[in-house]
Every structure is written in structure tokens, then in C-alpha cells.
């Protein structure tokens, strides 16, 4: 069966329909159950990270190797022609696209991946994060984890806590879950880091229920998923960071009265916002969530680079 993601740029989670999201998740589940070590044999994929990353970069590169493909690229753009000689991003992508079958790209500038897609010819760009904008593959692994732990993606009560202004993961995840039915959102953040107005407007236009809170305690008993985020020091001025960094911290005592099926997720890295005593509770699932990134990213790359895929 022809697959609709073949050679498709994956820039925003909004580039994927509900059917396409479900296709990726089915493929991820299949790859988790039955590895396919030669699925992308003879393919070459560029890993271009213009911004620091540990989990996302290593997860992508591991995914590439486990599918039998080769990976080339860089994790520090300061040593590239773009960083040292002033080459434009457009020229950099125009050249790299002549070497490889796909490009995985992270960049600090919002919209950089979509710009790159204009200059990569028929070589698909996979956005691994562009500034505070989008992080679609994190969203895919989040969806995969929610489905794995809850058995569904409809009728989920989810709280998102912390930095909802600059946290691209919560923007993408809210947009993705809005494609499913009956989901309810609880947004818990200080005013300075509130969910952007365009996300709230999208929910209102779709008549999706959401509420704003200043306390985690009042919503925990209603939740299926508690999605914690860190305050992003690199995107705040020092005075603002100092004011908000410790405002929302999850401790195991905060989970008293939680539903049995509750899972605590976090895109990582964790700084102060989840204390280590939470790790020992049955609710903690953030390390397994990170591990699911391998299968979600394998699935996406396999679909983007195979005209027909039946697993």
C-alpha cells in the first residue's frame, strides 16, 4: 500500500493528519515489537544540529543506525561553513541535500526547518526542533507513550505544567491531541510563561475544553497524564528565570489521590521540576517515554523514505 508520508517534509505536527499520525504510531508499535535492521539499508541521512541536544540527536542517530542507514552531519554548527564563513542556511541545505536521502535538522531560529525545506529539493526535512516553535518528533513519541500507557488517544485528561510559553513540546502536543476526540486540557503555569494565545484560540475554535490553573494540587485527581516541563533558562533573561524556575515542582506527595492509570511524562532534561522521589512511584514514566523516541523516530524515517511500507 502506498504511504502518504513518502518524501514528505515533517516540519510541524500540523503537517500530519490524524490518519497519518495513527500510521506513524502503528509503524512504531510494529518496530518496537519486531526490529527491522535493514529497512533503510544503503540510505544516508544527515543529522544537522545547529543547537545543543543530547536525547533528540542521539535518539535520531540510534534510530538511523538500527534501520541500517548511515548517518553524517554535525552537532556544533560553529565548525561549519555556516558558522565560520557566514554561508547562508539556504546554501547549506542546498548543498547537503545533494549528498543524502533525508535531513534531520534542529535550529534555534523559529521557522528555520520550513525555510530549509524550500532549498532541499526532493530531499525531505525532518524538524528536530526549531526555536520555541515546533518539535514534531517529540510529539510523536509523546503520543506513542500516551497510547501505550492509556490504550487510547481520545478522552484523555492531560495537565501541562511549567514553561508553556517557550516549551515547543507542549505546543506541538496540544495541537496533535486536538486532532482526537474528547480530550481535556489543564494548563498550569505562571502568567509570564502561559500557553500562547494562538494555541488557546485553536482550542476554542475546535470547541475543545481547557482550563487555566495556578495550582497542581487541585487537578491531580482528574488526570490521566501529567506532562511536566522545565523552565528554559536559555530562552529567558536571568531575572525572569530566577523568578519562575522553582514555582512548579512536582514531589511524590503531590500525587496523593491520583488515578491508578496516571503517568507523569517529561520531555527532559529534568532540572528541579520533578524531585527524584517521584522516580520511585508507579506514576513515573519519563525515562520509558524517552526510550520510545527510538521507535517513533524509526517509524517516521521509515515512512518518509519508503514509497510502500507494510510492517
From Swiss-Prot:
Keywords: Pyrimidine biosynthesis, Transferase. One of its GO terms (molecular function) is aspartate carbamoyltransferase activity. The keyword Magnesium does not apply. L-aspartate binds at residues 85, 168, 230. InterPro entries: Asp/Orn_carbamoyltranf_P-bd, Asp/Orn_carbamoylTrfase, Asp/Orn_carbamoylTrfase_sf, Asp_carbamoyltransf, Asp_carbamoyltransf_Asp/Orn-bd. Gene3D superfamilies: Aspartate/ornithine carbamoyltransferase. Belongs to the aspartate/ornithine carbamoyltransferase superfamily. ATCase family. This is Aspartate carbamoyltransferase catalytic subunit.
